[in-house]
Amino acid sequence: MTAESMLFNGAIVAIVLVLVGLAWGFLLLKIQGGEAE
């Protein structure tokens, strides 16, 4: 495994984690907002 492929995989993992985190946060906000109303 070369350094370039490790860097590439790391970038993909980071992007996926950010997207999942945003989706999860958005979901929690919608759920909390629904309960508050």
From Swiss-Prot:
GO function terms (MF aspect): electron transfer activity
Residue stretches spanning the membrane: 11-29
One annotated GO biological process: photosynthesis
Membrane topology designation: Single-pass membrane protein
Pfam short name (any one): PetM
InterPro entries per the UniProt record, alphabetical: PetM_cyt_b6/f_cplx_su7
Quaternary structure note: The 4 large subunits of the cytochrome b6-f complex are cytochrome b6, subunit IV (17 kDa polypeptide, PetD), cytochrome f and the Rieske protein, while the 4 small subunits are PetG, PetL, PetM and PetN. The complex functions as a dimer.
Protein name (database record): Cytochrome b6-f complex subunit 7
Organism field: Microcystis aeruginosa (strain NIES-843 / IAM M-2473)
